[in-house]
């Protein structure tokens, strides 16, 4: 019939003008498990329809994400019918492993394995945790697919330009930031989730999620880390244990045990 043809033509037009239209070539979509990256994934799916084989959606689990984050990723995958590859760092070759919602680490095991291998703690200057647990883990998986080059799709909004870094010179991927091109702000993301039948079950404070990503990250404010210690002492204890194990601190002269 003619109706599918009209729908296909409309989709082609949307792809031609939309900032969410997939670029040519291989694409790795980074899904952090937060509201912004989930919104980005939704918009990409709305524009392009089912993703072709040259596109993969991946989540790199550090083991320090809140359980609600893991559940949210799984729910997005199921509701939107999009496969998500769950990855974790491992110290042995190929230095990543594929897991799933059921088998994913929930007590910082990948993070601890990295700290034990490095024999020192990451900090605000040497953020090897982000590099190894997230970026390099994703790149190693992409290389395992036989990809020589690809686009790395990341969920940075137009209102957080300070987070935009220069293109890494030695990497095989190019950054793709559709939310920046679309002019998306945190207000847009919050408005989207108010309209949805489900949401990330973590507190949203003016577009920010204090317990998002790594629960006790040393880049978070003292107030956020103190709230974790107060409300989730069993989770906060992991950060204290890492400092004791290394006889060092994540932040200079600010040991976690003193909060």
Predicted features, each with a name:
Residues 1-259:
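Nucleotide-activated chemistry modules centered on ATP-dependent adenylation/adenylyltransferase
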């Amino acid at each position: 019939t003619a109706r599918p043809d009209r729908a296909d033509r409309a989709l082609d037009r949307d792809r031609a003008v939309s900032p969410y239209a997939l670029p040519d070539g291989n694409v790795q979509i980074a899904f952090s498990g937060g509201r912004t990256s989930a919104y980005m994934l939704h918009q990409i799916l709305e524009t392009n329809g089912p993703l072709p084989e040259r596109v993969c959606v991946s989540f790199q689990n550090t083991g320090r994400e809140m359980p609600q984050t893991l559940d949210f990723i799984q729910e997005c995958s199921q509701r939107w019918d999009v496969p998500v590859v769950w990855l974790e760092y491992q110290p042995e070759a190929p230095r990543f492993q594929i897991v799933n919602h059921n088998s994913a680490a929930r007590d910082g095991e990948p993070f601890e394995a990295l700290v034990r291998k490095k024999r020192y703690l990451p900090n605000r200057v040497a953020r090897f945790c982000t590099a190894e647990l997230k970026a390099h883990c994703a790149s190693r998986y992409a290389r395992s697919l036989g990809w020589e080059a690809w686009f790395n799709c990341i969920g940075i909004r137009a209102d957080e330009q300070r987070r935009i870094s220069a293109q890494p010179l030695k990497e095989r991927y190019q950054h793709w930031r559709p939310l920046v091109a679309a002019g998306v702000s945190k207000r847009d993301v919050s408005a989207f989730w108010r309209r949805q039948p489900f949401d990330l079950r973590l507190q949203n404070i003016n577009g920010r999620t204090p317990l998002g990503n790594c629960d006790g990250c040393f880049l978070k404010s003292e107030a956020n880390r103190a709230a974790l210690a107060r409300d989730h002492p069993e989770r906060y204890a992991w950060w204290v244990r890492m400092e004791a194990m290394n006889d060092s601190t994540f932040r200079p002269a600010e040991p976690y045990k003193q909060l």
